Amino acid sequence: WPLISRELDRRRSRNYRGVLFADVRDTAFQSDPFGAMLTTQQIFYGFNGVESRTIGECGWNGGWIRDCFGEAKRRKLASKPIVCSGVSIATFEEGRLYAAQMAEVVSDAQFAPCERNGVDQGVHNVLMHENEVKHAVIVSQRTALVANLQAKVARVDPRSHKVANPRGDVVSVVHQYDRFPNLAAHYYETY
């Protein structure tokens, strides 16, 4: 996050319209996410992950928050939905500010003992649910143009390999496609 934050600061004067943060290992694009989502001047979109359980019901997400921010913070956020850190989309300035917030948290010496794989999602959830991210909107998997396939809400067409949300809208971004072996094989063959 410190490197991402510095890079966005460096590019601040280039008039970029938006920024997308994504896990590169398991994310694919079906269309331009910026055209569909960046329709206002200032916005930061976070997307729910698995919607069938809360932070408090999930050992991973609850554990990341507990280990990095303490049991009191985990209890405070226990009833909140899990917001996936695997894909976020924002107007440039909101994305730049978010990256700076993430960098500040993970660079703190007190954060070092809790650092491990996936812990950035705990930080992401704290920032989002504590209203620390300017102009943040949390979007449900049922209406999102980003599909988190771990949530098991999106539909994958077995013939076209297109992914759609429950409303039938073809999504712009597919995250965690490796949860569907046939879709992953299609992407590997295509790209």
Residue ranges and their predicted role:
Residues W1-W60, G86, R96:
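GT-A fold catalytic core of metal-dependent nucleotide-sugar glycosyltransferases
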